[in-house]
Structures are given as C-alpha cells and as structure tokens.
Amino acid sequence: MQKFTVHKGLVAPMDRENVDTDAIIPKQFLKSIRKTGFGPNLFDAWRYLDAGFPGQDPASRKPNPDFVLNQPRYAGASILLARKNFGCGSSREHAPWALDQYGFRAIIAPSYADIFFNNSFKNGLLPIVLPEAQIAQLFDEVNAFPGYTLTIDLERQVIVKPQGKELPFEVQAFRKYCLLNGFDDIGLTLRQSDKIKAFEAERLAKKPWLNHTIPG
C-alpha cells in the first residue's frame, strides 16, 4: 500500500449528499476477480452518457460534459471534496479501490458511511472529517478559484489552504500509523513473519503428525 505522509493536490468538488457506493462504482463492474482496473469506471453512470459494461474501452465512451470530473479545470484532481454521508449503501470494497485507482489520495467530507470509512483506510485512501461549516467554505473557495489546491499533512494532522491557513483534523492513532508507513492488513501481518515461523516450528515440534499429508 502506498504511504501517505504529505500530499498536495488539486481539489474536485462532489456537491451531492448521500453519494452511495453504487454511484461510486456500479454493480456491473464488481464481477472482476482482480483488484485493479476500476478507475475508468469511477462514477460511471454520472461520468458517461452511454451505459457501461465490463471490459469496455473507455476511449469509446461518451463523456458527460456536465459531470465535475470531466471538466478541464478539475483534470488530475487528487483530493475529493464531498458532502455528508459519503460512501453510503452496500458494503463494496471496490468503492475505495475505484477512487484510489482514479487518482484520489484523500476525501474531505462532514461524514461517511462506517464501512466505506473503514475500507478507505485499509486501502491507502485518507477520509478526512471536517465540520459542515468548513466544508461549505471549502466548496465556495474551490468553485471561486480555478486550480484550487490543498496540502494534507497527515503527520501534523492539518489541511493547509493556499493562503496558509490550517484546518486541523482527527485521525485514530493506529490508522494514522498504518497510512504513514504504507501498511495494509497483509503488510501488518508480514511484519510478524518471524513470530509466525517460530510458532509454526514449535507447533510441528510438539505435534509432528500435523506435517504429514493425507494420501490422495
């Protein structure tokens, strides 16, 4: 998992409440047995004028010119500004996968659905919670100033606005540790590989029959 320490990026505003996971990555794209390739279908039903299907060449699609991520001023955005209850709906880990693979490193919103919130941390995507008043002000500034960027300093737990003003945010210590070091669940487990190997060796020494395979 990619480390998250300090990130400066262009902000794209998703000015809708209750954006659910089916809007983030529609159900027809969940058939893939791979963990990659979801970025082109992020917000698929809003992003394109034609219906999408798995394996389709994105270059053959008809982009919706009115959708925020298709507007030239937000090309290359890596921070998504959203409204309350972002990521509600069904429990699909594909939602943070799609956001990450599109290029987003962080989301800033007043609130999130719990499962989406947890899945985001586990996949290297930082979901930041700010008060609605601060979110509203950020929307005003992003809309008013093309090329609006923010700097997110996870170590210090602050968002730095273009003029230098800092907005503090909270993050649970263990989640912060994992993001700073790029540890997902597998990475955390592998850090204990010596202890795991020692346990297996001790177990086989005490119960050697466990090392025998059953003839086919």
UniProtKB/Swiss-Prot annotation:
Q: Which GO terms describe its cellular component?
A: 3-isopropylmalate dehydratase complex
**What biological-process terms (Gene Ontology) are attached?**
L-leucine biosynthetic process
Top EC class per UniProt? lyase
* Pathway named in the protein's UniProt entry: Amino-acid biosynthesis; L-leucine biosynthesis; L-leucine from 3-methyl-2-oxobutanoate: step 2/4
Please provide the record's keywords in A-Z order: Amino-acid biosynthesis, Branched-chain amino acid biosynthesis, Leucine biosynthesis, Lyase
Q: What is its EC number?
A: 4.2.1.33
Indicate yes or no for the key word Lyase.
yes
* InterPro entries associated with the record: 3-IsopropMal_deHydase_ssu, Aconitase/3IPM_dehydase_swvl, AconitaseA/IPMdHydase_ssu_swvl, IPMI_Swivel, LeuD
User: Which family is it part of?
Assistant: Belongs to the LeuD family. LeuD type 1 subfamily.
Q: What does this protein do?
A: Catalyzes the isomerization between 2-isopropylmalate and 3-isopropylmalate, via the formation of 2-isopropylmaleate.
Please name the HAMAP family in this protein's record.
LeuD_type1
This chain's protein is named: 3-isopropylmalate dehydratase small subunit
Q: Which organism is it from?
A: Polaromonas sp. (strain JS666 / ATCC BAA-500)
